[in-house]
Amino acid sequence: MALVFDVQQASGKPDDNRRPGTACPFCNTEGLTNIIQRDGDCIWLENKFKTLRATRQTVLIESADHDADLVTYKPDELHHVMRFALDCWQQMIDSQQYRSVLMYKNKGPLSGGSLVHPHMQIVGLEQEDGYAALTSANFEGIDVWQRGRVAVNISTEPIMGFFEVNVSAPRGIAASDDARDQAETDLFADAIQVAPVSYTHLTLPTI
């Protein structure tokens, strides 16, 4: 089996990345439907444009600010966004309804993303193992920084690019009430913020 892309669904998507001036649906929060969870400005909802068959596609709006970005968030906002995102991702994993669950963020006009407004996507794959081609070697590399269980390295076995940075932390820490886990969740967010995101593949803790 393989993921099937539905071209018909994709044809109706708003795209202000390639067509500046297009109305942003994420700015009009009153018009949003099928909201799963909300915490402050963070909104997790069903993706209106289901372009991948045999999946559950959801979107996580990070901020009410259309021009905001992970690299510009103040510490409190950054930590809130990342905790919310990791918690939503963990919820889909814990549901055991999917063979695998992916969380990712497309950034920039060449990333394939259609909307500028800061957001991530969490996708449950019903039949596919999205991690099947990954090995522990993909998360290893030249050590750059480590504090506690949070580490940053330059990958020596990049997944899809010439230059990738791995930011790793123990899986499930965001859902824990333990003070150490919460502190390291914030460290994980801090490390992602300072990484050179224009040139990296940021690896969330998946294995």
Outline where the language-model segments fall.
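Short "domain-exit" segments at the C-terminal end of structured domains
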Residues: 203-207
